[in-house]
Amino acid sequence: MSAEVYQPEKDTPAENLTYVSELTDGRNLYQISITLLDSNGHRSYQASSMLQVQVVGGRLLGLENGDLADVTEYTANYRRAYHGELIAYVQADSDIPAVVTISGEMLKTLAVTVPANN
């Protein structure tokens, strides 16, 4: 399993920045792209493992997998990967970095750090 952290505000067109800021109360919003990998380190398109996401020092806003048939509540802290991917939206709400832990059955637990809200 791998994860990359993105900050949508840095790639958002200027006309949309106010909207993003209103949604997040001016706090930083991060998108974490989670990819399930095979034993060779390649994305496993067949993987649909149930993943759980825990956040310490921040807030999980939602999980998205791109599967239109998945009716899991958006704000739940669990969701199945779809075609080997899952996206977590996290908000830092303190002056310390948030730690995001991703786990799943028969998968190594992965922890990523999200920068503090400055």
Which residues are covered by each model-predicted region?
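Beta-strand-rich structural segments
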Residues: 27-44, 51, 100-102
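Short, hydrophobic beta-strand segments
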Residues: 74-94
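Short aromatic-acidic-glycine turn motif
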Residues: 52-70
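Edge beta-strands of extracellular beta-sandwich domains
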Residues: 1-9, 108-117
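Solvent-exposed, conformationally flexible loop/turn segments
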Residues: 24-29, 95
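Low-complexity, acidic Ser/Thr/Pro/Gly-rich terminal tails and inter-domain linkers that flank the onset
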Residues: 1-25
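Beta-strand-rich extracellular modules
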Residues: 103-107
